[in-house]
Design a protein with these regions (language model features):
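A structural micro-motif
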Residues: 41, 71, 113, 142-144
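Residues at the C-termini of beta-strands that transition into short coil/loop
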Residues: 47, 77, 147-150
Length: 157
């Protein structure tokens, strides 16, 4: 599969161990997928992801960027920005989720198979995905699957 990796994935990979049992499980599943499954896929990211990943604690930012370095960088073109604007203007995502809109737009415009995320608020959210899918179809695109690493584990096992 051709998969877009957004910022939450490297963030979970380098984060300090969570105390919350759900977050701890998500960290472990993400590590397992990254170690065992990523090699079976073509992974992509964008400059927007690199900018997000490079912010914050210097050591963690460096570790995130190191994980993302081998991934192919997709262009954030005018078409990507226009599609992201439609997501925001349509109220599908709130104005402060402009980077999340850009992640969806990048994966959609570049016709990838999936967008890998652990952002349950704005991306891995069935009701939001329904609206995103309608918009994508109206604009002549197929929305990539927006899913967690766990959803892609069966591809390899």
């Amino acid at each position: 599969m051709r998969i877009f990796v957004e910022t939450t994935i490297p963030s979970y990979l380098v984060a300090r161990p969570a105390r919350d049992v759900v977050q701890m499980a998500r960290q472990q599943i993400t590590r397992d997928w990254w170690e065992r499954c990523r090699g079976a896929h073509e992974l992509f990211t964008s400059q927007i992801v690199l900018d997000e990943a490079g912010a914050g604690d210097a050591a963690l930012a460096s570790a995130r960027l190191e994980l993302l370095a081998p991934l192919e960088l997709l262009e954030v073109s005018d078409s990507v920005l226009a599609f992201a604007r439609k997501i925001l203007d349509g109220g599908i995502l709130p104005p402060d989720a402009d980077r999340d809109a850009a992640h969806v737009a990048t994966a959609t415009i570049h016709r990838l198979d999936a967008l890998l995320s652990l952002n349950f608020r704005h991306l891995v959210n069935a009701s939001i995905q329904t609206c995103l899918r309608r918009l994508a179809l109206r604009e002549g695109y197929d929305l990539p699957a927006i899913c967690t690493p766990e959803a892609l584990m069966d591809d390899i096992q």
